[in-house]
């Protein structure tokens, strides 16, 4: 099993603080905020599949926003009352990585949710590299679009 220090070395300081200590990257600084290439987003810690570019939208909030995870079972929701706010924290199911928060102000036509996710918690797998990266089983989600 990977130690915390080995994990920090593998994913970097910011990703470690975000995923392991629920830190938040500064708005408009993450690499995936204004990024709309075709592919999937996985947990930077475990590689578990989380979100698709098909469900990503520009919310203007300063962080990547998604209308839903690829499958709802891939994330868990937790009550968060930190910083004097009442929010719903989103974590990856397998690794328990802090990803961000979910809000009820997303596009109505897409279900009304906005998953506001830290770029540092994600790794993007481009569509044309999904097979060689071990995500071939997820290629079919793009056939439906």
Curated annotation (Swiss-Prot):
Domain MsrB: from-to ranges: 4-127
Enzyme class label: oxidoreductase
The EC number(s) this enzyme carries: 1.8.4.12
The keyword Nucleotide-binding is assigned to this record: no
Catalytic site positions: 116
Gene Ontology MF: a single term: peptide-methionine (R)-S-oxide reductase activity
Alphabetized UniProt keyword annotations: Oxidoreductase
Catalyzed reaction equations: L-methionyl-[protein] + [thioredoxin]-disulfide + H2O = L-methionyl-(R)-S-oxide-[protein] + [thioredoxin]-dithiol
Name the UniProt record assigns to this protein: Peptide methionine sulfoxide reductase MsrB
Species name: Streptococcus equi subsp. equi (strain 4047)
Gene (name only): msrB
